[in-house]
Design a protein with these regions (language model features):
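Tryptophan-centric aromatic hotspots in well-structured domains and transmembrane helices
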Residues: 36-38, 111, 232
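Short hydrophobic/aromatic-rich beta-strand segments that constitute the beta-sheet cores
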Residues: 13-14, 66-69, 94
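Hydrophobic beta-strand positions in extracellular immunoglobulin-like domains
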Residues: 97-98, 232
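Well-ordered beta-strand positions in beta-sheet-rich domains
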Residues: 80-82, 225-229
Length: 262
């Protein structure tokens, strides 16, 4: 894993051997790597530079990399990221903090946005609330799991999926890699206005997609902090996911991994 403190404390590379998962800046010089946004998207576009693109301060403490942004004048908050690896299961734990730097009560939710080259298969358990909006993506729902198989022929515009999840994980399979995010599951009622726990975005030029998860939308008193932990797993896995048996096999593998089973 590589982190660029000079560009919003982004995670800019995640590899297994020579296989890169994340979208690189050579493909899109603005939207690449993985970052944290503040939800809901009241800030419009682009994201506040001081949180998304400006330099973060850095320190190392107890084998963890700790990154801190400045305070954004619009959102009245700052972001801190603490990242460390776990030797036992070769995962990475990312602890995000959003700190209210105003003198009034504000409401936020954390929003992790991870950009990868367009392609592959993305899947996650469907929550009780299901889709919050009509999805523009061609998805398959089978035995409680939402499956998205990328097909460039079906992409003719920006496309997005909004869904309430379950079990607290999202997985993405490429030709050679299986990537899994584990995070605290939230209910429909805990989602930020106009947002959902799981969101997928496909760029209209078919070059990249975003794997997005969000945490609970909460009120913060002045100087209070949201703390949100996400765990990443990356495994080399080339199995196809086309038949029911193949889907069952990969689901069993993912669930064992996120539950800490051998």
């Amino acid at each position: 894993m590589l982190i660029d403190a000079g560009c919003g404390g982004r995670i800019v590379s995640l590899k297994s051997n020579r296989h890169e998962l994340l979208l690189q800046d050579s493909i899109n010089p603005i939207n690449y790597g993985s970052t944290l946004w503040v939800s809901p998207q009241d800030w419009g576009w682009p994201p506040p530079a001081i949180l998304d693109r400006d330099r973060y301060s850095v320190r190392i403490e107890n084998n963890s990399l700790m990154l801190s942004s400045g305070v954004d004048d619009l959102m009245k908050c700052k972001i801190e990221k603490t990242i460390h690896s776990v030797v036992g299961d070769t995962s990475f734990v990312i602890e995000y903090k959003i700190i209210n730097e105003s003198d009034i009560i504000l409401k936020y939710a954390p929003w992790e946005v991870t950009r990868v080259p367009a392609g592959g298969i993305t899947f996650f358990p469907e929550g009780p609330a299901g889709g919050k909006r009509q999805s523009k993506l061609n998805i398959i729902k089978h035995e409680g799991i939402v499956w998205f198989y990328f097909d460039p022929l079906l992409v003719n515009d920006h496309q997005k999926l909004f869904y309430n999840g379950k079990e607290g994980w999202l997985a993405h399979q490429t030709n050679s890699l299986l990537f899994i995010k584990r995070y605290p599951d939230i209910s429909y009622e805990q989602e930020a206005p106009g947002e959902t726990e799981v969101e997928l975005y496909i760029h209209k030029n078919r070059t990249y997609m975003e794997l997005e998860i969000q945490g609970e939308y909460v009120s913060l008193s002045p100087k209070d902090t949201i703390v949100w932990k996400v765990c990443w797993f990356l495994r080399e896995r080339q199995n196809k996911i086309e038949t029911d048996d193949e889907r069952k096999n990969v689901l069993s593998y993912v669930r064992r991994l996120v539950n800490g089973e051998k």
